[in-house]
Every structure is written in C-alpha cells, then in structure tokens.
C-alpha cells in the first residue's frame, strides 16, 4: 500500500530494514518529532516495541537486552535532551561492546542554530563512543534516496554487531506532518518496488569479520602452551553473548591449565565445572596481607609465578587478580577480536587478534595431550577449596582462628542468593560492592547461571533498567542484586516491570550510603568521609516497592539486630526462595552495616590467607 506521505514512507523503509537485518525489538520513548518512527515500529508485525517513559532508563533497558542476546536493540526518541539522555548507556555500550542503535529524531537542518524550540546540535552527539554515525538526509520519495537509506541501516546494524561490536547512531530529521496523514502527491505511485519495499532479507547482507591468527602464528602459540608447565587461562568479563565455556574448558583439558573465571565471564557457572579446574575464589587469597603476621609482604610471593597466561575477555573485576598478573613476569597473551588493548596494567607481552572462543577451540585441537604441572594446578584447586570452606563455615558462625562474634555481612547475601538460584537463571549484579562480593564469595557451581553486569565504565546508574532489559530477552528467572544508591539512581527503571511485562526478584543490599568507600583510604578522614563519600540517606524503600507493585520483605542483618549470621542467612534463603517461586515481582531489602561488613571481609581475608599461605586453619 502506498504510504500517505514521505515521512511515513521513510520511517517504514527504515524499520523494515531493521527487521530484515534480524532486529526483533525496539525501545521507544514518547515524543512528537519521532512520531513517524514510533508509528512505523508499532505497525510492524514482526517487531516488539517496548515503551519506556524515561530516555535514560530506555537506553539502559535496551543495553541490558542487547547484552543478554548479543543482538542489536534500537532506541527511538524525539529531539533535544531526550537524545542526550542516551549518552550514559552509549558510553557503557561502547566500552562493554554491546550492540545498540540510537535513532534520534531531529528538526530539519534549516532549524538548527536558529533558536527553534527543542532543537540542539545532535550531529555526532556521542562523539567517539559510537562505531558508526550518519546524519540522514530529510525524507525523499525517490528510488536512489530509499536505496541509500536501506543501505545505511544495513551497514549500521552490521557495524553494531561486527568484530568490534558497540553502539551506532543514526540522526533522523523530519519536517511536519509527523503523523501518517495523507499529503496529496507527496509519494509517487511509480517507485521502484525494491527501493520502496526492500529485498527478501537485508538490502545489504553484511558478513561479519572473523579475525583469526594464521597457521604459523597459531602453531607458535600452541607450541608455547604445549611446552609450558605452569600456565593460566584468565577469563575476564565477556563481550556479548559471552565466552563459549565448552571451548575454554576443552583448552584447559588440553593444556592442564586452571581457569581463573570472573563471575561475568560465562565460565564460572555451568555443568562444565564438574570436570574443569574452574577457579573462583582467587580474590580471597591473591596478594592478601596477613595482619600482624606477614606485615606488608604479599602472601602471593609464596607461590610460583605462572610461565604463560592466556587472557580472554575484558580486564578482570578483581583488583587483586590484576595486581597478581601485573607482577608475575609471565608471557601474557591478551586475546581480542578487534585488536583493542584492554589490559591497564600493561603487563601483556602479546596481543592476539582473534575471537576468543574460536581460538580456544582451535588451540585445544592443536595442543591436545598436554598435562601441565599437576602440583601447580592442585595448588589453585586446593586454595579455592579452602577459601570456599572458610566462607561456608563463617555462615555457620565460625571464622577459623578468630574468637570474635561472627556477623552476617554483605558477601553472605550473595552466597545465599547464588545457592538458591534456579536452573537456569539470569543474575544481574550491580557495580560497587555486589559484583566484588560475587567475585570473592561465590565459587563455581554447576547451575546454569548467566551472570551479567555493567562493567564497561562501571557506573551505578541504569542498573535496574539494564537488568529488566536482560530479563525481557529470556524466559529464565531474573534476579537483580543491587545496592541502595544504585537502586535510588534508577527507580524509574522499575516502571518496566509492568510496562514491559518483566518479572524480577530484586535483592537490595541497603547499607545506607556508599559502603564501598569503607574499602578506600578516605575512610580515615572525617568529617569528609561521612558527609561527602558515605553520604547516609535514610531512605525507606518499602513505599517505593508499593508504588511499583512489588511485594516487599525486609531482613535486618545489622549486628545490633540479630543473634547470628546463620539466622539471617536462613531468613534470606527462605525469603528469596518464596519470592522466586511466587508470581510477580518482589523486593527483598537486606539492611546491613557497611562498616561491620568491611570488618568481616578483612577477618575472612586474614583467615583464608593463614589457611592458604601460612598456618593451617583451625
């Protein structure tokens, strides 16, 4: 059917081309100038439209969905500050390599720099954060313009999902009328059908690149792995859609190297952990100082250094692991499909341009039969077992060689939730302390868990929206573990529970402010610490749960409110299991004391260090 006007024709062609390129959902926010795009999306049968009121939340929702699927999720917004509100999520997508497409509607060019209402300079609005940018021409109802439009859209999607995935930006100007009203003689009746309606499939089929080392380079790397006794595979936070755990496991078996798996790598959790040496508690015993026993000496000095390290994904969450790797002196191969540098300690000796999972699969076939050093592998496995045992005993009220009362701490909350996750599950963790506690206190498990977080630029904004976006792309049960400040930053995101039909169990770790700053030297400087860093707020979250229709449970885990860590853990386990199995969404608020949790982390650190590097745990 002939379009009623050129804007409708243009928007319809753009949206059609997105669907042809494999897009199955868009996230749109209400606005006038974007009307042609929103209407075209709403009238497309093969496209799901998520309507989000707030553009910042919308962008993070799309980010979370794209992170979960590895496929581009377009955004649609009107002109002006609406487009600017996408910027934080675009920054995260750029650093974390998440495919996004920002479709920002705009006034026509003659109104720019004219004082016209709701008009700003949107050209290259996101700067170098996007992989591809195009300021589209005004809609033109002719064959050449439509072919150009379709080609540009196909290129944008192909770039967003390419070897170096990330956000792309198309700025789309429209004149009035913006609604699908008929304008006499605005659209010719004799348009080329291919230009008007597209081809079967994408107008331009963009074949993604697959960088791989040549045979000679692969043999050299394989030979070094095969002749190395003490090697490590370090799996950092993975680019969407994640590392292939089976391929990484196969390489571990072929070389005999243990896998140090970040919780966001896609390798720490899953059935492969039954047979692979997956190490997860390294943050508890690497580079730890034993207070009063080892002085300033690094406990990791007692370990032999690795000879070779194969690094996959982004830089690990664990600062201690990064420090350990920086000081080893080993040959370190940083694997990156786009040839970008992602290792801020500058300890890597080689940059291997390759897709990590495919490289692991090729290397595992090449070096099959390597054993590595059994004692070296056992050292890591034993240390991990000891750390997990001590963390488990602490839950039962027993820190080895420590006679002080045991207090429930925030890391316990992560362990309780992880132990009770269904199979399969999607777990989204906030930045600040939750992701660090997940890293240190939750070891490998056979449960199929997709663990996600925003570790690109590691902000605490947009966490709720990102989690719900991820939940919109899966039938898994969705759990979000979030801090109080991160939840406060993104309460608008909770609107998606109802508007986008997503259910979630939200576990809120409320320590009344910036608990992570207890981990930093600024803690010693008062009153600046409390007034400008800790920033206690006293917010009550139950009314917020009522506002957004979440069932609510409060668990008070502060030391002056409980008898033992075990009681709180049991209460949390019961609350989480009940919420998980119930219909709808649930907020479980766990009130904690940041200073107490900080002390308990330090006590556990010392206990693990004594057991792994010094005296045996009692």
From Swiss-Prot:
Pathway: Quinol/quinone metabolism; 1,4-dihydroxy-2-naphthoate biosynthesis; 1,4-dihydroxy-2-naphthoate from chorismate: step 2/7; Quinol/quinone metabolism; menaquinone biosynthesis. Its EC number is 2.2.1.9. Pfam families: TPP_enzyme_M_2 (PF16582), TPP_enzyme_N (PF02776). Its cofactor is Mg(2+); Mn(2+); thiamine diphosphate. The keyword Transferase applies. It catalyses: isochorismate + 2-oxoglutarate + H(+) = 5-enolpyruvoyl-6-hydroxy-2-succinyl-cyclohex-3-ene-1-carboxylate + CO2. Keywords: Magnesium, Manganese, Menaquinone biosynthesis, Metal-binding, Thiamine pyrophosphate, Transferase. GO terms for molecular function: 2-succinyl-5-enolpyruvyl-6-hydroxy-3-cyclohexene-1-carboxylic-acid synthase activity; magnesium ion binding; manganese ion binding; thiamine pyrophosphate binding. It comes from the Archaea. Residues 192-215 are annotated as: Disordered. GO terms for biological process: menaquinone biosynthetic process; organic acid metabolic process; sulfur compound biosynthetic process. Binds 1 thiamine pyrophosphate per subunit. Belongs to the TPP enzyme family. MenD subfamily. Homodimer. Catalyzes the thiamine diphosphate-dependent decarboxylation of 2-oxoglutarate and the subsequent addition of the resulting succinic semialdehyde-thiamine pyrophosphate anion to isochorismate to yield 2-succinyl-5-enolpyruvyl-6-hydroxy-3-cyclohexene-1-carboxylate (SEPHCHC). This is 2-succinyl-5-enolpyruvyl-6-hydroxy-3-cyclohexene-1-carboxylate synthase. It comes from Halorubrum lacusprofundi (strain ATCC 49239 / DSM 5036 / JCM 8891 / ACAM 34).
């Amino acid at each position: 059917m002939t379009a009623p006007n050129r804007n409708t024709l243009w928007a319809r062609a753009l949206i059609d081309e997105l669907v042809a390129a494999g897009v199955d959902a868009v996230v749109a926010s209400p606005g006038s100038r974007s009307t042609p795009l929103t209407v075209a999306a709403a009238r497309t049968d093969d496209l799901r439209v998520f309507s989000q009121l707030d553009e910042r939340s919308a962008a993070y929702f799309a980010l979370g969905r794209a992170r979960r699927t590895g496929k581009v999720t377009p955004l649609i917004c009107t002109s002006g500050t609406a487009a600017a509100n996408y910027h934080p999520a675009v920054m995260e997508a750029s650093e974390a390599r998440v495919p996004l497409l920002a479709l920002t509607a705009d006034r026509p060019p003659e109104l720019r720099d004219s004082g016209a209402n709701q008009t700003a300079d949107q050209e290259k609005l996101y700067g170098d954060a996007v992989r591809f940018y195009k300021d589209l021409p005004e809609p033109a109802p002719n064959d050449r313009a439509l072919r150009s439009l379709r080609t540009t859209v196909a290129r944008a999607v192909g770039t967003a999902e390419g070897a170096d995935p990330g956000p792309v930006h198309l700025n789309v100007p429209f004149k009035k009328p913006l609604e699908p009203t008929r304008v006499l003689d605005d659209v010719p009746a004799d348009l080329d059908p291919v230009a008007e309606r597209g081809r079967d499939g994408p107008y331009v089929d963009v074949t993604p690149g697959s960088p791989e080392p040549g045979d000679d380079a692969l043999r050299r790397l394989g030979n070094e792995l095969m002749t190395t006794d003490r090697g490590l595979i370090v799996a950092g936070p993975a680019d969407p859609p994640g590392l292939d755990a089976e391929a990484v496991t196969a390489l571990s078996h072929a070389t005999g190297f243990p896998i140090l798996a970040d919780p966001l790598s896609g390798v720490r959790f899953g059935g492969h952990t039954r047979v692979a040496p997956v190490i997860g508690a390294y943050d508890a015993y690497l580079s730890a100082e034993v207070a009063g026993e080892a002085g300033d000496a690094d406990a990791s000095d007692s370990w032999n250094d690795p000879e070779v390290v194969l690094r996959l994904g982004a830089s690990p969450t664990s600062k201690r692991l990064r420090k350990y790797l920086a000081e080893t002196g080993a040959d370190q191969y940083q694997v990156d499909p786009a040839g970008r540098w992602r290792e801020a300690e500058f300890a890597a000796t080689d940059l291997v341009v390759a897709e990590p999972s495919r490289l692991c699969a090729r290397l595992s076939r090449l070096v099959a039969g390597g054993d590595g050093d059994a004692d070296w592998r056992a050292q890591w496995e034993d240390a991990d077992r000891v750390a997990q045992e001590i963390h488990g005993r602490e839950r039962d009220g027993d820190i080895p060689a420590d006679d002080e009362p045991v207090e429930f701490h925030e890391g316990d909350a992560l362990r309780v939730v992880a132990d009770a996750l269904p199979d399969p599950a999607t777990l989204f963790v906030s930045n600040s302390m939750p992701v660090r506690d997940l890293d240190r206190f939750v070891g490998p498990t056979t449960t199929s868990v997709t663990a996600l977080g925003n570790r690109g630029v590691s902000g605490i904004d947009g966490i709720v929206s990102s989690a719900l976006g991820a939940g919109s792309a899966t039938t898994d049960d969705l759990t979000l573990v979030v801090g109080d400040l991160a939840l406060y930053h993104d309460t608008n995101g909770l609107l998606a529970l109802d508007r986008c039909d997503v259910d979630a169990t939200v576990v809120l770790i409320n320590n009344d402010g910036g608990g992570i700053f207890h981990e930093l030297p600024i803690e010693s400087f008062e009153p600046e610490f409390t007034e400008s860093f800790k920033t206690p707020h006293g917010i009550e979250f139950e009314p917020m749960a009522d506002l957004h229709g979440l069932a609510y449970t409060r668990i008070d885990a502060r030391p002056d409110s409980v008898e033992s860590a075990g009681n709180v853990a049991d209460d949390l386990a019961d609350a989480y299991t009940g919420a998980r199995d119930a219909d709808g969404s649930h907020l479980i608020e766990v009130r904690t004391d940041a200073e107490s949790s900080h002390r308990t982390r330090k006590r556990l650190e010392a206990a693990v260090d004594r057991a792994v590097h010094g005296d045996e745990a009692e």
